[in-house]
């Protein structure tokens, strides 16, 4: 696939990758969700692995190619209040506080802008204000937090101190109903977008939770012979190289969603290993499959420190699979830089594209 994708007046240009596999420091361990900070930096929640390695939140500066920088990390593994077991969603409040959902504890932990623990709220259960395996979280313009209460198939709105404000949704496949919802995003008007994981769609709701639109339909990419992967969600049939061939409008367990200022909608199509792009009316535009042909700065540092890694890398007959997404889980759009940032979970990296607003195609004189 080309490094630049042009469709209906929009161009999406691959920029660079960030990351490497690492249980701490400059890298990721199954990055699961992300959010933008108030200064345009990025917070990444790492799921970690079954050996309790790598659970944490990274605070990073993205910038352009080679400009990435690790600013801090916190919410590491443990049972204390300042720790997380299964960090899932992450959001930044108006005052810079960072909110992290813990799927295992069914709580929300709050940290200040420097990563210092402030407080924790949330009680396991299925009653009003209780949580069961909370997933995505997002901060409204009012300062309230919308939590994707995944295990209870609903959304709940809380004050920054954890007081319940409202809730909507229930289990099901109808309008405004959910089946293991995952990621969440808001548009500039405060409308809510939810990645409805097991219903294979994204739902758009009004700021008060009224159903407005369903985006996407269920479908799988063609599966290659004997293609198989094991993720932290269990065994999963996988076919990374064929992701490019599937129609743009189908979704297979979508996990993350973002909306840009033009209203275009970006969906992490987890099961199909790609990023699907829709217009503001929910019509499919195109999809991206990952184009990391250039090693990330942090990855290159690992190779420079271990020449045997480069020897092994150069023996690979076809590197194309390494360029592509493998179970992408999250996406954010930075309106200040027009960057589309995708959490390429199984590759332990972020892939960065840029939406080009002034793109002019090459004109040949014939």
Specify the residue positions occupied by each region the protein language model found:
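Eukaryotic scaffold repeat domains enriched in small/polar residues
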Residues: 1-366
